[in-house]
Amino acid sequence: MYHTRTSLRTIQRTVWLPTDDTLVYNVSMSVLPKFNRGVTVLAVLSALDRRETYGYEIRREAFRRTKGLFTVNEGALYPLLHSLVRRGLVRVRQQKVRGRWRKYYRLTERGRKELSTLRHDWKNSLGVLNALLG
């Protein structure tokens, strides 16, 4: 069995010695949503790295760059964009297109630095995963 007083959120600071499949399943269920969120952040910032664009194009760019392996969920995209704007990583402007207002997003200098850091961190993480899986 495993220590039950420590929540799974503190798993990074705790060494676990699983004795059954329950722990592995619980760890996977707590890690995968964070992994997907991290991939979504990387996909959105990467889509904005080349040019200013709007939400639908961000989703298309992520889909195109991953050859259809990853899609940015619309329900996750706009809250994430608002968060990135609040954090100063992305700027937003509005423009009227065919009678409707459209929000265009672009990376700030701070956003470019964050993207560079994320790319470096993800490359290191992928190296570890490849070593473990390969």
Residue ranges of each PLM-predicted region?
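N-terminal helix-turn-helix DNA-binding core of bacterial DNA-binding proteins
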Residues: 32-76
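Beta-hairpin "wing" of winged helix-turn-helix
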Residues: 85-101, 106
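Amphipathic alpha-helical dimerization/coiled-coil segments
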Residues: 7-19, 26, 113-134
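Basic amphipathic alpha-helical segments that dock to polyanions
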Residues: 77-84
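Intrinsic-disorder-associated, low-complexity terminal segments enriched in Asp/Asn/His/Tyr and depleted
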Residues: 2-3, 21
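Short alpha-helical segments that sit at the start of domains
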Residues: 12-51, 83
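Basic, amphipathic "hinge/linker" alpha-helix immediately C-terminal to the N-terminal HTH DNA-binding motif
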Residues: 100-119
